[in-house]
Amino acid sequence: MAHKKAGGSTRNGRDSESKRLGVKRFGGQTVLAGNILVRQRGTQFHPGLNVGCGKDHTLFATSDGTVVFETKGPKNRKYVSVVQA
């Protein structure tokens, strides 16, 4: 008689869903007010001119224009700005 014993249990087999973080609009791209520029955890990028910061640190455009990434300040922080054309 062919019998199959019970399979052993495992503690693996689960993973969290990806959060789709990162830069959504790159330098030189044209954006409209309200467009999301960066989704991030913490302030990897800081808001510059015409850019707002949401409670989850999402950066978004507050006016129409072109996206500009720049590094400035004594701590070499990365800033995202929207320059009006």
UniProtKB/Swiss-Prot annotation:
Cysteine pairs bridged by disulfides in the record: none
Chain intervals for the UniProt region annotation (Disordered): 1-23
Name of one Pfam family that matches: Ribosomal_L27
SUPFAM superfamilies per record: Ribosomal L27 protein-like
Keywords (A to Z) from UniProt: Ribonucleoprotein, Ribosomal protein
One MF annotation (Gene Ontology) recorded for this entry: structural constituent of ribosome
Gene3D superfamilies recorded: 2.40.50.100
UniProt similarity note: Belongs to the bacterial ribosomal protein bL27 family.
GO term, biological process aspect, one: translation
Name this protein carries in UniProt: Large ribosomal subunit protein bL27
Domain of life: Bacteria
Keyword Repressor: no
GO cellular component terms given for this protein: cytosolic large ribosomal subunit
